[in-house]
Amino acid sequence: LNHIHEACAESQDYLFELKQVTQKLDINIVSAGFDPISKLKEIPNNPKQRYELMTKDMPLGGELSLDMMYRTCGTQLNIDYNSEEDFIKKFKIVNSIVPISIALFANSAIVEKKKSKYLSYRSKVWQSTSRGGLPKIFFEELDFEKYAEFVINFPILFIQHEGAYISGRKYTFKDFMEGKIDKIGNRPPTENDLTTHLSTIFTENRLKKYIELRSMDTCGWDCLCSGPAFFIGMLYGNLDEVYEIISKWDKSKIINAYLEAPEKGFNTQLMGKDLLYWASTLLDLSKKGLEKRDILNKRGKNETLFLNHLQKVIDNRLTNADHMINKFSKTEDLSELYDK
C-alpha cells in the first residue's frame, strides 16, 4: 500500500466483510480500546500452549498483564525508516508523543459495564503490564546498536524448543546467545528465536523491520484512519520540525505525562502546557506534512481529509472516550456502545 487512501480503503473492505459475518451470526461489534462488558474471569482462555505459559508468567511482572492479553484492543501502525538517522528521529518522536497519543485517541472509559475514572483504561492496563511501558532509554538518541543491546539484555518470555514452549523469564536473550540455558541443551538461538523474542517485548513502541506504534486505543470507522494520517503527516512530511520541538522536552516530564494521561487526558501537563495544546500543535504540523505529500484520491482530495475527525476532537475538546461516557451515562444501555 502506497498511501493512506489505499490503506483506508483496504480497512473499509475488511470492516465490510466483518459486518457481513457478524450480522449473520447476530454478533455486535464494539469499537473500544477495552472490553466494556466482560469480567476477566468470564473470558475463555486461548487454547494455544504459549497463552497457557503467558497466563502463568505474565502477572509476575505486572498486575494487569492478563487484562492486556484478554481485554484490550489497540490500533497498531507500522512505519518505515530509510536510514539509521531517520530511525533515530522517528523513534524518539513517537516515544516522546505517547502521552499525546493516549489523550487524543482515548476510547476505553467503560469497564465491566461501569464508567471508570480513566478515559483510556487500555493505556492504564498497558502501563501495568509485564514487559511494557516506556523505558527511559527510548528518549535517547537510540541507534541500532543501542536498541540491539536493549533487546539482548531484555528477559525472555518463552522459547520454542522441540515442539514445546518453555519459560525463559529467568534468562535474557544474551544468556541464550551465550549458551547458558541448560533446559534446551545450551543451544544457541535461531533467527526464529530472535523474531519471537522481539514480538514479546510489549513496550509502547518497538522496532522490528519497521517501527511499530502501539499507543492508540482502537476506534470506530469515523476515526480509524485518523491515526495513520496523524503520524504519517508528522513523520513522513514534517519530521525535522517535529523533532526540533520534542528535543526540548525533559524525559522525566514526558514519563510523568505518560502516567497521568490515561486518567487526565487533555488536562495532563507537559512542559508547562496541557496535552490539548500539544495535540493541536502536532495536528497542524501533520496537516502541513500531508499537504506537502499532496497525494490525491479519485475525487481530488489529499490525505488531510483523514484528519477531520481529530480536528473535531480538538475543537470540541471531546474525545471518543467522552462520547462513550455521554452515550452510556444517558441510559446506561450497553447497546449504545455497539457499532451501528
State what each model feature region is:
Residues 1-7, 80-87, 217-221:
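A generic structural motif
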Residues 16, 92-95, 99, 280, ...:
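Generic structural signal for well-ordered, non-transmembrane alpha-helical segments
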Residues 140-161, 276-303:
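An exposure/low-complexity boundary signal
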Residues 1-65, 71, 209, 223, ...:
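Terminal catalytic/cofactor-binding subdomain
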Residues 171-256:
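Long, well-ordered mid-to-C-terminal structural blocks that present hydrophobic/aromatic surfaces
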Residues 23, 28-30, 34-206:
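Loop-rich catalytic cores of soluble enzymes, especially ATP-dependent carboxylate-amine ligases
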Residues 82, 99, 218, 236, ...:
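Residue-level marker of positions within ordered structural domains that often coincide
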